[in-house]
Regions:
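Short, hydrophobic/π-rich interface segment
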Residues: 83-129
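A short, structured loop/turn motif at beta-sheet edges
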Residues: 45-54, 107-110, 139-145
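An N-terminal amphipathic alpha-helical segment
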Residues: 55-97, 101
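Phosphate-interacting basic helix/loop segments used at nucleotide- and nucleic-acid interfaces
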Residues: 35-49, 122
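Acidic, proline/glycine-rich low-complexity IDRs
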Residues: 127, 132-163
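Active-site-adjacent core segments of small-molecule enzymes
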Residues: 24-27, 45, 122-127, 132-133, ...
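Exposed alpha-helical structural elements
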Residues: 18-21, 43, 110, 114
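Non-catalytic accessory regions used for complex assembly or targeting
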Residues: 1-37, 95-98, 163
Length: 163
């Protein structure tokens, strides 16, 4: 008679993490971040208007688990202009501190941050697999942000024949 050792590891003990509490905390954090956005957006539009910028375009592209903003362009009417070297307050939450942190960011950096935030909120994982591309328009005159989002996907069609 031979003695056979088990080949499977012993089962793991039950988790001691309260996942319901983790989800509640994440939901509360997301709500706090969402509550900061209107004031950040208003400060951005005020800064763009003061600089004479009528709108900003942001193009992005990604696929294969990698994506980024390709270009951020500022416009005064139909004329491309440079962003001025000014900073505005931007309210944010960091991972390691529950308090709101006020940062001084350039207008261009605030545009970039908001674009990434809105992409994550509306189309999380946009850069994965076949990816996506598109454009934001931050319209300072209308005080609105417009997103055109193009999702790539692989499709297949089945054809059957009998001969």
């Amino acid at each position: 008679m031979t003695h056979v050792e088990p080949t499977l590891a012993a089962p793991m003990p039950p988790s001691s993490i309260d996942f319901a509490q983790v989800f509640v905390a994440q939901s509360e954090r997301s709500a706090r971040i969402d509550a900061l956005r209107p004031a950040n957006r208003d400060r951005l539009f005020d800064g763009l208007t003061a600089a004479g910028i009528t709108h900003v375009t942001v193009t992005f592209d990604g696929e294969g688990d990698s994506g980024q903003i390709e270009n951020i362009g500022a416009w005064a009417g139909d004329k491309a202009v440079d962003f001025p070297a000014v900073e505005i307050p931007y309210a944010a939450l960091t991972w390691d501190n529950p308090e709101v942190e006020m940062r001084q960011l350039s207008l261009e950096d605030v545009v970039e941050q908001l674009a990434y935030d809105f992409l994550a909120d509306t189309h999380g994982g946009w850069e994965n697999n076949n990816g996506a591309y598109g454009e934001f328009c931050f319209d300072a005159s209308a005080r609105c942000i417009h997103l055109e989002f193009n999702e790539r996907f692989t499709s297949s069609e089945l054809f059957t024949h009998e001969f």
